[in-house]
Amino acid sequence: MTVIQVDGKEYEVESGANLLEALLSAGLDVPYFCWHPAMGSVGACRQCAVVQYANEEDTQGRIIMSCMTPVTDNARFSVATESATGFRESVIENLMLNHPHDCPVCEEGGECHLQDMTVMVGHHDRRYTGKKRTHKNQYLGPLIGHEMNRCITCYRCVRFYQDYAGGSDLSAFSSRDKVYFGRAEDGVLENEFAGNLVDVCPTGVFTDKTLAKHYTRKWDLQSAPTICVGCAQGCNTYTSERYGEVRRVNNRFQKDVNGYFLCDRGRFGAGFVNSSKRIKQAGILGEDGLYQAVSLVDAIARVRDMIAASQHVIGIGSARASLESNQALKSLVGEDNYCNGMVDIEREMHSVIVDVLKSDIATPGMREVEDYDAILVLGEDITNHAPRLALSVRQATRNRASEMAAETRLALWQDAAVRELAQNSLSPLMIATPTEDRLDDVATLSTRLSPADIARLGFAIADRLRGNPQSDSDALKATVDAVTQMLTDAKKPLIISGTSTSNPDILRSAANVAAALKESNKDTGVCLCASECNSIGVALLDNQNSLPALLASSPDTVIVLENDLISATTTVLQQQLASIKNLVVIDHL
């Protein structure tokens, strides 16, 4: 820890931090725009100015940008001195010269960083009476709105989109005093994290179009902490509703999971909840083939009578349903009459994942993934099946830049300087997938193989790491050599795989590689991505009962819990379902 003096008071702050971060952590109000805790400092907005004094005798001091200043022991600063407050007010007045002052109709109104900072510095008079600079807005797709006239050129948007998320179709364009942030031409933003522009932008340049369709101010929304069900990563979210409809989903900061960012599937993928086609009350199928709406009490009584009159009742759970719901169904029908709803290949794959989770190999969270210095991806398109994990992998490739910065004693929060130093130097990322991968642009080695060959590759790498290369094939030898060397050179390697190829051998090979690295005393991690949000939970409840066997046992009544069996099962299973006397479906869709 480091001790600094601010306006005559001593504060103990984190060593190595920049001054702005230290001041904010100490509870002091310092306005800022361009700095972001996940993206570091570039000193673009000049809003975080404070005064630094050379020593105790210095009463004049000099204005410095706190986001670009490292904290040092016994350094003396002032946030409240007149020269600092006057400078900050003049900066925000200059930023507001061309701003449209359209807060009453702006979607950011009431939760706008620019509003907060303007009030904080005390700027309330507008002296400028000239013409404002104006821009034409772009169409950026159905999810994100664009109002360029509100821009204050903080550069957060392009820094996130290009530098952090790896996007290439959003840039800064400038001529004289006109700076424009957008695409080269109208079109849908391609990056799967584009929705974070809404959060990253401190003004209302990028807005949530799905919210704008039925806009509601923040204070009129009822919000609750939730967990995203878009994949199995468990990102933390806030879901907000009004008048019984979901209006928006926002990222909820969780330092060990999703941090500050959320994928677009998680942010914009909840629209199905408001569908008019959802069955929102209990119904009983009549003889005419139509559903008759009944009260929940009557529906429960009807199901109770069905169960009482049945000789054989089975329950089919689901990886979409919660652990509590699956356990309740299991308790209702009995251990021998319950299955978790997975087909055999899914049960086999998730059994492998559970075995790995029970082993002594580390299974890092998404934040921890960013600390690994070499990553091997076997068979899994993580950008599509675990998008937030892919963003963490992209950050992990910058660990070589972190090493270079440490060698030159350059602070990591000096983002532009670190990127300039590293250029294209990246930590090893090796990808073996059946199709092109969105992470190929930062991959050291990227190869396209069939699922069977990917499994063979994994086993060959594990054998080579153990000094037993008998399973090497001529076609894979060069890849095995390259990957083995990179993993051997790494201090902290990570192996990633998943269920998207429906090949259990790929998962076994990934676990085998991780085990081989662990045997050589490497600080090894393994991430095996599950199919659905609660696949691991129901895999832990697995009692080895298969779905086909249970349906073939001639049940009178089948209770299906949040499982879309029609789309997931074979024709034979569908025919078995059609012959069931009593079919009870419990779902939220």
Regions found by a protein language model. Give the residues of each.
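Short, structural beta-strand-to-alpha-helix junction motif
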Residues: 3, 17-21, 322
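A basic, amphipathic helix-loop patch mediating RNA/tRNA/ribosome contacts
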Residues: 19-53
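Ubiquitin-like/PB1-type beta-grasp interaction modules and other compact soluble beta-rich domains
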Residues: 1-2, 11, 35-37
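Short, contiguous acidic and Ser/Thr-rich linear segments
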Residues: 9-17
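Fe-S ferredoxin-like electron-transfer domains
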Residues: 46-229, 233-237, 242-246
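Short, surface-exposed linear segments at secondary-structure transitions and domain or protein termini
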Residues: 25, 68-79, 257-261, 455-457
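Catalytic alpha/large subunits of respiratory electron-transfer oxidoreductases
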Residues: 96, 100, 147, 154, ...
